């Protein structure tokens, strides 16, 4: 594992998406972090050792999804599909579909498998799946503050994990989307989907893929409203853990009472024209029960 030294840093951003504000001073203790996201091979070892069944492989409870069509209550997960041309990017159903049978073993559905993807990040894992793996490995998932501090790699004020220039010297530093989203990906960075973990340079703490490739689970409940900044570094909150669970429910879907966690880092689907979230400050809300083809995780070990 890689050592993350801890310290006081400026979390969030006032220059991008509203849910990233306010930029504020926060302190985290030192800890250890997996240098790479958990791979398919590593997750398979966990399943083989424990017999664990992921959330995407279990039947759904109709009471949790009022009004859902019966075909959407069979085990499965959300799968990205490239569109045939330009679409309304305000409607994610244009490129996300619930696919019965999709799970970590079959990321795109029953016709897919993990052949040649052993060293790719495991996806289609819900929050419960990630925490189960972490417990088996003797580890935990990071808080949002821990994750963001680690992602910055010592570059507290930089926009990206590696600095302020997105393509330094024309070099791709992360697995993101190049081209008009979601209908054409030029794959100029070498990958149209997930990439093997560690395909791009590490940050200052020796951590790979802290931007792009796959979003990563954290333990914090999501709220679009963050605490205000403090007047002095001496007053910075120490090891914050986010709001209460009740704050995380989606106000746009009041009938669905599935809480949401913060995911960080962006993914191979993030594009400058649509989702410019391949930055340390970026964050997104994710329902805890939902696996998707662009969400994975990595673990931490905190000092005793």
Regions found by a protein language model. Give the residues of each.
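Functional-site microenvironments in short loops/helix caps that host divalent-cation chemistry
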Residues: 3-4, 10, 14-15, 59-280
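C-terminal, low-complexity/hydrophilic appendages and adjacent surface loops
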Residues: 18-21
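A short N-terminal beta-strand-loop micro-motif at the entrance of redox/enzyme domains
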Residues: 25-31
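Short capping motifs at secondary-structure boundaries
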Residues: 31, 46-55, 137-138
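An anion-binding catalytic pocket shared by soluble metabolic enzymes
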Residues: 34
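Acidic-aromatic/histidine active-site loop/patch
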Residues: 39
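Short proline/glycine-enriched turn/loop segments at secondary-structure junctions
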Residues: 251-255, 284-291
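Short, structured beta-strand segments at or near domain termini in extracellular proteins/domains
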Residues: 293-304
């Amino acid at each position: 594992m890689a050592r993350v030294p801890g310290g006081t840093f400026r979390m969030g951003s006032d220059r991008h998406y509203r849910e990233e504000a306010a930029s504020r001073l926060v302190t985290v203790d030192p800890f250890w972090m997996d240098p790479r996201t958990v791979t398919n091979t590593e997750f398979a070892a966990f399943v083989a050792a424990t017999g664990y069944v992921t959330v995407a492989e279990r039947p759904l409870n109709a009471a949790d999804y009022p009004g859902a069509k019966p075909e959407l209550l069979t085990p499965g997960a959300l799968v990205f599909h490239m569109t045939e041309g330009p679409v309304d990017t305000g409607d994610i159903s244009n490129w996300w579909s619930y696919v019965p049978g999709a799970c970590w073993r079959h990321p795109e559905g029953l016709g897919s498998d993990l052949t040649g993807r052993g060293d790719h990040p495991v996806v289609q894992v819900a929050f419960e799946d990630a925490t189960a793996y972490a417990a088996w490995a003797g580890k935990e998932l990071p808080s949002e503050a821990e994750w963001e501090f680690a992602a910055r790699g010592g570059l507290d004020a930089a926009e990206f994990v590696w600095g302020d220039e997105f393509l330094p010297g024309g070099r791709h530093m992360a697995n993101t989307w190049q081209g008009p989203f979601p209908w054409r990906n030029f794959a100029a960075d070498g990958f149209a989907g997930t990439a093997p973990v560690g395909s791009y340079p590490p940050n200052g703490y020796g951590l790979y893929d802290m931007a792009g490739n796959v979003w990563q689970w954290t333990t914090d409940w999501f709220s679009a409203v963050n605490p205000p900044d403090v007047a002095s570094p001496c007053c910075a909150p120490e090891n914050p853990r986010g709001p209460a669970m009740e704050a995380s429910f989606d106000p746009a879907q009041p009938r669905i009472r599935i809480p949401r966690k913060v995911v960080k880092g962006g993914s191979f689907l993030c594009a400058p024209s649509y989702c410019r979230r391949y930055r340390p400050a970026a964050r997104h809300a994710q329902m805890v029960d939902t696996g998707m083809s662009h969400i994975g995780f990595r673990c931490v070990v905190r000092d005793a």
